[in-house]
C-alpha cells in the first residue's frame, strides 16, 4: 500500500463508519455513544482507484494525563505521526464545537497534510456546520455521508489533490492494477475490497429542499448589491453609482419558495492591471473564495454594455473552477428594443462561451425586482444539472451508439479503440473514458463526446470534465509498468 491516512476527530463524528466504508467491511464497532473506539486500528483500504492503509482512531478527548481518555488521545497522536495525511472528521449536522477547534489546532501543529471531512452532510441542518467548518483553518470541507456512501468521489479527488498523483499512484500499486480485469459488472467492487452495497448503482433523486449557495459576481457597478437588496427586501448592502462600493464578500440568508439560500455578494472584479490598492486586492481575493465556496454563480452583466473583456474573463474563471454559471442581464428596464437586444445577447452568449453550451441567461431589473423568479428557476435547474449522476450502464449503452455512429479516427495508421466510460464525480459532472493511446486522441473527438453527453443526458450550461485513461480499467494505468 502506497500511503497511510489517519481518520481523526472528536468522539461520535462518524470516524469508524468512514473506516468501515473505506475497508469494505464492518471491522470497527459503530455506536452512537462517544468513545466506542479506544485503540487505533489499521487496515488496507480502497477508494475507487486509490489503494492505501487507513487508521481508525479513538475520538480525541481533553483529559488528565493518567486517565483512559488521555491514553486514547496518545494512541490518536501516534496514528497522526505514523500517517502520511489526516482525514479530520467533523459532524456537519452538530456543527463545530470547542473540542473540534482545539483538536484542529493540534492537527495543524503536527504539520501533516489534512483533508477536512464534513460527515453527516445528508442531514437536514448540516449546511450551517459546513459554513462554520471554515473557521478551523483546515481548508474547504469535503461533504460526505459515510453511512450512505455519498460524496465518496469528492473525497477521492480531495485526497489526490492533497498528496499529488505521483504519490498516490505509485508504480508498485499500478503493476497490480494493470492485471485486473475491469468490466461494467465489476463496478460494485471499486469501493472497498469486499463491500456489499445494494445502493451502488442507485442514482439519488435531486433534493430540491437542500440549502443552496449562490455567489453573485460581475464587473464593478453592474448592480450586484442592488439585486441582493431586492431579493432580501431590505437595504442590507450599500449601493450607489460609485464603482467598487462593496469591499468584501458579504453573505446573507434568504428563502425562495421555501428553499433556504445563502447569497454571497462579492466585490466588483476588475482586471489585474487595475487592481492597485492592497485593500482592493484582498477584496477580489475574497470574491474568488466566495466563488469556490458557492455552488451556482450568477454573473451579473450590465445589459447596456454587456460582454466586455472582463465579463468573459470572469465567466472563464467560474467555468475553470467547475462552478455552475447563470447569466443575469441586469438593468433590463433601460433597454428599449428588448426583443432585438435579447436575441443579440443570446447569440453572443452561445458564441463567446462555447465551453458551456446551453448556458442559461435571463434578463432582469435588480432595481425594480423584475425577472428574479425566472432567474431563480434557471439557477435551480442549473444546480440540478450540475449535481446529475448517470449510471454506468446507461453511459456505456450510449457510448456504443456514438462510436457506431462516428468511430474514433485512425492515427498513424492505427485506429484508436474506446473501451469503456464511467462517471467518477459530480459538481460538476466528471467522466473517465478508457481507451488506447489517450495522448493521440484528437480534441475534436473529445468535444464530440462532451457535446453528445450534453445533448443525450440533458446537461446544458454546466462544465463537463472528461479524462482519457489507458488500460481496461479507467481508474488504472496512471503509471507505466516497470520493465
UniProtKB/Swiss-Prot annotation:
Keyword presence, Repeat: yes
Matching Gene3D superfamilies: 3.30.300.20, P-loop containing nucleotide triphosphate hydrolases
Database matches in InterPro entries: G_ENGA, GTP-bd, GTPase_Der, KH_dom-like, KH_dom-like_a/b, P-loop_NTPase, Small_GTP-bd
Residue intervals of the EngA-type G domain: 3-167, 212-387
Residues given in the record as GTP 2 binding sites: 218-225, 265-269, 330-333
Superkingdom to which the source organism belongs: Bacteria
MF-aspect GO terms: GTP binding
Binding-site residues for GTP 1, renumbered to this chain: 9-16, 56-60, 119-122
Keywords for the protein's UniProt record, in alphabetical order: GTP-binding, Nucleotide-binding, Repeat, Ribosome biogenesis
Biological processes, Gene Ontology terms: ribosome biogenesis
PROSITE patterns hit by this protein: G_ENGA
UniProt domain KH-like: residue ranges: 388-472
Keyword Nucleotide-binding found: yes
Pfam short name (any one): MMR_HSR1
SUPFAM superfamilies: P-loop containing nucleoside triphosphate hydrolases
Record note on quaternary structure: Associates with the 50S ribosomal subunit.
Protein role: GTPase that plays an essential role in the late steps of ribosome biogenesis.
Record-stated family: Belongs to the TRAFAC class TrmE-Era-EngA-EngB-Septin-like GTPase superfamily. EngA (Der) GTPase family.
Name of the protein described by the UniProt record: GTPase Der
Organism: Brucella ovis (strain ATCC 25840 / 63/290 / NCTC 10512)
